[in-house]
UniProtKB/Swiss-Prot annotation:
GO terms for cellular component: nucleus; transcription regulator complex. Disruption phenotype: Nr4a3 homozygous knockout mice are viable and normal in appearance; however, abnormal hyperactive and partial bidirectional circling behavior is observed by 3 weeks of age in 15% of these mice. The circling behavior is interspersed with noncircling periods of feeding, grooming, and sleep. A small percentage of adult Nr4a3 homozygotes displayes brief freezing spells with tonic posturing that are exacerbated with handling. The overall food consumption of Nr4a3 homozygous knockout mice is higher. Residues 1-139 are annotated as: Required for DNA-PK heterotrimer. Residues 96-162, 268-289, 365-395 are annotated as: Disordered. Induction: Induced by inflammatory stimuli. Up-regulated by the anorexigenic signal leptin via the transcription factor cyclic AMP response element-binding protein (CREB). Suppressed by orexigenic signal glucocorticoid that mobilizes NR3C1 to inhibit NR4A3 expression by antagonizing the action of CREB. This is Nuclear receptor subfamily 4 group A member 3. Transcriptional activator that binds to regulatory elements in promoter regions in a cell- and response element (target)-specific manner. Induces gene expression by binding as monomers to the NR4A1 response element (NBRE) 5'-AAAAGGTCA-3' site and as homodimers to the Nur response element (NurRE) site in the promoter of their regulated target genes. Plays a role in the regulation of proliferation, survival and differentiation of many different cell types and also in metabolism and inflammation. Residues 141-150 have a biased composition (Pro residues). Residues 290-365 bind DNA. The lineage of its organism: Eukaryota, Metazoa, Chordata, Craniata, Vertebrata. Phosphorylated by PRKDC.
Length: 627
């Protein structure tokens, strides 16, 4: 910490009044172990001058001094901030003089502890400056600081200083034995302070990052620590006879400084032209307002085609729709799609775009050039519509989006290969175990079908009896259709609704010949190249159709018409990869034939009676019999 140091010799008789009066009080305080330990010696060669023009002459402070002066240049001194800090050295005859400051203000004593002889004053017009107005200014943030020394706020020394009758006797500053510094031209026009160190490289700053300065307004707030105002009044008369005639009765407040702190003072920062707090640079890793892409997980700033996606997935989806591109998955149609692997399988990436809800109808085509696509507004709920007006039918695009979301939600997210075995060991186990596995797979499919049907718009508006009848009548058709869509039958891999992956050999003993019919239907269905919209409509139409025993068949027929209209509208707008309506109708006919074979398989297992069927399967089997 840079500072000005001086050692004092025994005081002359004329300057020891404060020693005689307050010596006993401040001797015990200054020797208290709580005082800061500092080492200061101007004679050391380790102290070096860093500036020669930033301080005014010390002769400004020595006007009227009755001793001889020896000239020394004013400079800044720097000393290492580390090392042991012994107590302030007190020499005989001086240890009781000029220690009227608080123990945090020892820098004033350390700056003036050298003891050369002082020549007479350099000029009659020089004035004595009170040392109590010196304070510490905070360094700029680039200078490393010692745990906080908040500076005292005050104005700079910009005007000529008048005599301060209310200030305290400066003590050792007026020692006749002290050497004076030659005056400078404009010394009285500038404040006494240490200029801030350059930011690069950081150098130790005085007093833990603060600078010594003079503030004439601070003298009005500082005085000797007399302990009480009454003591000052009784001793004012005695001090009138002091050689320097500085009365003490006008200031009764004790001279105290705030304790050291770690935080920088905003007042000092404003004096140095700094902002109270320096804002930290923005963090580029996480920008506010950004989310993650619903397709690959990359950063996404806004929504594209109805879903928050990144620019890469937005462009991929747009190009695929505009060019009617056809993709083929080389794996099992469940490739991982993330930021690193999103370009590996275009088929799975496009299917995931559709599954998260990206709407192809919003993509501009040749008929919509120059216009920005807009998502259709959501239809008003029945409570928001006027009761006198009939509720208009839902727009086809809303029905299509709901069907796609329902189908994707029913698709298992993770595949379970724990039981997959393509070797001859797949046939291990008893016949009863394979039959029980067959029943378990059918039961799991029924639960998935119920949750999927509730997401179809208008299905929950039907009577409960009709809802149950439709689900139970179509449970085998839904089981076969989902199994055909998910499975990679070309490699004999069958993916069931719970994510379980089994080889054909593992299913053959439970499914029998019905498994081969399912495989053929799956190959034919995949050869049709139906998009996910057509598959969603195919799944809905396989359940929502005319059934014997419906209470309100008219409403079921209306719902079926809405689904068919959505499929036609999807094809009419040119968004379908190929005309899908006739293909869907042919697939429905073939699907119902295969379900008849499934009923025959269940009937055969009941007759075999290896394992009793679950009650839900038994009930569904009896309800779906045509006779």
């Amino acid at each position: 910490m840079p500072c000005v140091q001086a050692q004092y010799s025994p005081s002359p008789p004329g300057s020891t009044y404060a020693t005689q009066t307050y010596g006993s009080e401040y001797t015990t305080e200054i020797m208290n172990p709580d005082y800061t330990k500092l080492t200061m010696d101007l004679g050391s060669t380790g102290i070096m001058a860093t500036a020669t023009t930033s301080l005014p002459s010390f002769s400004t402070f020595m006007e009227g001094y009755p001793s001889s002066c020896e000239l020394k240049p004013s400079c800044l001194y720097q000393m290492p901030p580390s090392g042991p800090r012994p107590l302030i050295k007190m020499e005989e005859g001086r240890e009781h003089g000029y220690h009227h400051h608080h123990h945090h203000h020892h820098h004033h004593h350390h700056h003036q502890q050298q003891q050369p002889s002082i020549p007479p004053p350099s000029g009659p017009e020089d004035e004595v400056l009170p040392s109590t107005s010196m304070y510490f200014k905070q360094s700029p943030p680039s200078t490393p600081t010692t745990p906080g020394f908040p500076p005292q706020a005050g104005a700079l020394w910009d005007d000529e200083l008048p005599s301060a009758p209310g200030c305290i006797a400066p003590g050792p500053l007026l020692d006749p034995q002290m050497k004076a510094v030659p005056p400078m031209a404009a010394a009285a026009r500038f404040p006494i302070f240490f200029k801030p160190s350059p930011p690069h490289p950081p150098a130790p700053s005085p007093a833990g990052g603060h600078h010594l300065g003079y503030d004439p307004t601070a003298a009005a707030a500082l005085s000797l620590p007399l302990g009480a105002a009454a003591a000052a009044g009784s001793q004012a008369a005695a001090l009138e006879g002091h050689p320097y005639g500085l009365p003490l009765a006008k200031r009764t407040a004790t001279l105290t400084f705030p304790p050291l702190g770690l935080t920088a003072s905003p007042t000092a920062s404003s004096l140095l032209g700094e902002s109270p707090s320096l804002p930290s640079p923005p963090n580029r890793s996480s920008s506010s307002g950004e989310g993650t892409c619903a397709v690959c997980g990359d950063n996404a700033a806004c929504q594209h085609y109805g879903v928050r996606t990144c620019e890469g997935c937005k462009g991929f989806f747009k190009r695929t729709v505009q060019k009617n591109a056809k993709y083929v998955c080389l794996a099992n149609k469940n490739c991982p799609v993330d930021k690193r692997r999103r370009n590996r399988c275009q088929y799975c990436r496009f299917q995931k775009c559709l599954s998260v809800g990206m709407v192809k109808e919003v993509v501009r085509t040749d008929s919509l050039k120059g216009r920005r696509g807009r998502l259709p507004s959501k239809p008003k709920s029945p409570l928001q519509q006027e009761p006198s007006q009939p509720s208009p039918p839902s727009p086809p695009i809303c029905m299509m989006n709901a069907l796609v979301r329902a189908l994707t939600d029913a698709t298992p997210r993770d595949l379970d290969y724990s039981r997959y075995c393509p070797t001859d060991q797949a046939t291990a186990g008893t016949d009863a175990e394979h039959v029980q596995q067959f029943y378990n797979l059918l039961t799991a499919s029924i639960d998935v079908s119920r949750s999927w049907a509730e997401k179809i718009p208008g299905f929950t508006d039907l009577p409960k009896e009709d809802q149950t009848l439709l689900i139970e009548s179509a449970f085998l058709e839904l089981f076969v259709l989902r199994l055909s869509i998910r499975s990679n039958t070309a490699e004999d891999k069958f993916v069931f609704c719970n994510g379980l992956v089994l080889h054909r050999l593992q299913c053959l003993r439970g499914f029998g010949e019905w498994l081969d019919s399912i495989k053929d239907f799956s190959l034919n269905l995949q050869s049709l190249n139906l998009d996910i919209q057509a598959l969603a409509c195919l799944s809905a139409l396989s359940m929502i159709t005319e059934r014997h025993g419906l209470k309100e068949p008219k409403r079921v027929e209306e719902l079926c018409t809405k689904i068919t209209s959505s499929l036609k509208d999807h094809q009419r707008k040119g968004q379908a990869l190929e005309p899908s309506e006739p293909k869907v109708l042919r697939a429905l006919v073939e699907l119902r034939k295969i379900c008849t074979q499934g009923l025959q398989r269940i009937f055969y297992l009941k007759l075999e009676d290896l394992v009793p069927p679950p009650s839900v399967i038994d009930k569904l089997f009896l309800d779906t019999l045509p006779f």
